[in-house]
Amino acid sequence: MVKNVFKKLGKKQKNNKGFSLVELIVVIAIMAVLVGVLAPQLIKYVEKSREATDIQNCDSIATTLKTYYSDKEGAPDTIKVTVSKDVDPVIDPTTQTPLKDTGLETTRLKGTKWDGNIDITYTSATGKITYSASSDYYTATGTDDQIKPKN
């Protein structure tokens, strides 16, 4: 009886099927090469995505300012919002309401390629928005221009 059990165990061990250590090392090496080649490209696209999100947030802030102050009596003549990487948007505390209403009061720049801040200035007399921003990917200066990708 005991001999039969050992014979069965011995047969099972001889019929083991699986990957050898060499095969596993080859697969890991191939995966490491693929990651090394593809990672820089992926990082570049992630950075562009962050900057595009920053631009969309700034456009939302500009639209919010236009909408809020188009109907507001006694609004200041000029409202300037500065969006940066390190601090929440800097504006006059009396004009903070439109950003709080839309949840944009804590918007910060997430892209790493911005040269500085994005300044958004709304002039109520003309109803125009002026952007001032610069990065490796995007630039804008002018009235009612969107922040556009560099060519």
Task: Cite the ranges covered by each PLM segment.
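Conserved alpha-helical elements of the SDR catalytic core
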Residues: 38, 45, 65
